[in-house]
Amino acid sequence: MMDPWQAWAWPWLTTMDIYRHALEPGREEAAAPKELEWTTPNRVTLDLPSLLLRDFSSGESRARPVLVVAPFSLHDAGLADLAPGHSPIESLLANGCHDLFLADWKSATAKTRLNTIDSQFAALNVVVDEIGPPVDLVGLCQGGWLSLAYAARFPDKVRRLVLVGAPIDTTAAPSAFSGMINPVTAALIDELIRRGGGLALGRDLAELWPRPSDKAARTLEALELEPPTTEAARRALENFSCWDARMLDLPGPYHREVLHWLYRENRLATGRFWALGRRIDPRRMEHPLFLLAGERDDIAPPAQVFAAAALVGARESDIETALAPCGHLALFMGRRTAETQWPRIAKWLSG
């Protein structure tokens, strides 16, 4: 017998399917989102099936390369370089991180629809080798758990680790995201992926993603702006709107594993997470660790982020934490956060 959630969700899936087949061509043409325009100059130095390696470096030295790992989730890596004054990339460069790279995940296609978490690990490993280990990893949101697991899987390839708004122990505190996932049955997830031809389509995931109903307030909160009065503020608003409209499609197996392994089963925090043939023990991550959480973050609440401190093998004196007075998106694109927290991270990375 269907539970109440299934009874609600099956009609939703069916309606979505009918709507897509009836209106998809015209809708896609009319609503095609603006392509990503980077705020900071960069060049692509490696093009893999699942990601691009972008080099933002201002010099030739590779003494302390920093690799920012964007989330492979609903939206693209534009959140790391949204607009002047709203860019972790810009802040890191301006404060001494001159050898700076970004893992920019591609939207999944028919060719990559079977990718798994292992596939993402393998791609990230190739990127680190391309840069030249050891690297400093800066994991943003979903890129955070991947970075922590990578540092535990390949400890000799990492020097320092920064996690920003990263869900590490997903049972440490309730979140809007876990609240969305918990009622969804495995059958519904499989059906969503089947209807996407093996992909979890971003436009479908967006319908389930928790977000405030007041879009204007959400935008201003994410950017940490008052009502815009300057051209720079208006540009930031426009860039946010374009970023918000660009959705990434996810490989079905990868999406399924993230939902089950990270959220429902909390495998990373409980030592039951496997990557590339080995069980991941967070205690193998003995490098200095910086944790940044948002005080009002309902996607990765502070307790989920700061739980990493008790899981890793780093010395207590090598762990630094910071709590920013903001929500989730403002950690990556907020003006105040870019002015205060990211320079602090850059200084810490130079240690």
Locate the predicted segments by residue.
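Short, surface-exposed "cap/lid" segments of acyl-processing enzymes
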Residues: 31-32, 38-109
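Short beta-strand/loop motif that positions the catalytic acidic residue
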Residues: 285, 291-293, 297
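Amphipathic, low-complexity, repeat-rich surface-exposed segments
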Residues: 1-52, 85, 107, 136, ...
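Conserved alpha/beta-hydrolase "acid-adjacent" motif
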Residues: 298-304
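Alpha/beta-hydrolase-fold enzymes
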Residues: 1-17, 132-133, 146-253
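Catalytic histidine-centered segment of alpha/beta-hydrolase-like enzymes
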Residues: 325-340
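Gly/Ala-rich beta-loop-alpha elbow adjacent to hydrolase catalytic centers
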Residues: 138-147
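Catalytic histidine neighborhood in serine/cysteine hydrolases
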Residues: 309-329
